[in-house]
């Protein structure tokens, strides 16, 4: 089980303890630091919707260190990011692979960042196919549909052609931070919070 640190704040009426993720949420910071699953997606979506209800115009920060995960879970987060009325700043710390890379690229243009030693990776969707021949045909068709869908999203977010995305995604396609800028996944490599455009992070 992952240990979640707690922090203690002086509220003026005494001390209050809260887990570190709740404390970060007060500063409009959301962390995706594990495999992207349905439970994680529901938590992240709830956080994003809460922040939108608190202030529909102020930027939200999403920090990503994820090996990827389930496509439907990732797309649910992606659609929510696009649903929000505010800018969303995305940051890659460590790695943003597969669906993690797609979510990184989904941030507001000009506000997608990576730390210097981050690694990003895109690839085609995969999944184990079992069942009858009819089931296998249906599942294979669904994988091809998702492949085209994800390629279209990445093409829109990066500025690359759909054909290039499909070609590059045939195998695990790794990028360093500077390469990710050239590819269009991110906009800037930063070493310090002061280099971002968001004052709440830079202060």
Swiss-Prot record:
Q: Which InterPro entries match?
A: ClpP, ClpP/crotonase-like_dom_sf, ClpP/TepA, ClpP_His_AS, ClpP_Ser_AS
Q: Do you know which CDD domains this protein is assigned to?
A: S14_ClpP_2
Q: Which PROSITE patterns match?
A: CLP_PROTEASE_HIS (PS00382), CLP_PROTEASE_SER (PS00381)
The principal location of this protein is cytoplasm
Give the GO biological process terms.
protein quality control for misfolded or incompletely synthesized proteins
User: Is Protease tagged as a keyword?
Assistant: yes
What are the protein's GO molecular function terms?
Answer: ATP-dependent peptidase activity; ATPase binding; serine-type endopeptidase activity
Q: What class of enzyme is it?
A: hydrolase
Q: Protein name, please?
A: ATP-dependent Clp protease proteolytic subunit 2
Q: Which gene encodes it?
A: clpP2
């Amino acid at each position: 089980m992952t240990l979640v640190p707690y922090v203690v704040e002086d509220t003026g009426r005494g001390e209050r303890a809260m887990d570190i993720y709740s404390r970060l949420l007060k500063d409009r910071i959301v962390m995706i630091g594990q495999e992207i699953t349905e439970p994680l997606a529901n938590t992240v979506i709830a956080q994003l919707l809460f922040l939108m209800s608190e202030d529909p115009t102020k930027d939200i920060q999403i920090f990503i260190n994820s090996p990827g995960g389930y496509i439907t879970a990732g797309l649910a987060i992606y659609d929510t990011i696009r649903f929000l009325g505010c800018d969303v700043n995305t940051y890659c710390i460590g790695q943003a692979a597969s669906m993690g890379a797609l979510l990184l690229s989904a941030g507001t243009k000009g506000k997608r960042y990576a730390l210097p030693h981050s690694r990003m990776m895109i690839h085609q969707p995969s999944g184990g196919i079992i069942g009858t021949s009819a089931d296998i045909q249906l599942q294979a068709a669904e994988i091809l549909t998702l492949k085209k869908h994800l390629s279209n999203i990445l093409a829109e977010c990066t500025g690359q052609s759909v054909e290039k995305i499909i070609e590059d995604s045939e195998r695990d396609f790794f990028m360093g931070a500077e390469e990710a800028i050239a590819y269009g996944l991110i906009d800037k490599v930063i070493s310090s919070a002061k280099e971002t455009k968001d004052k709440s992070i830079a202060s």
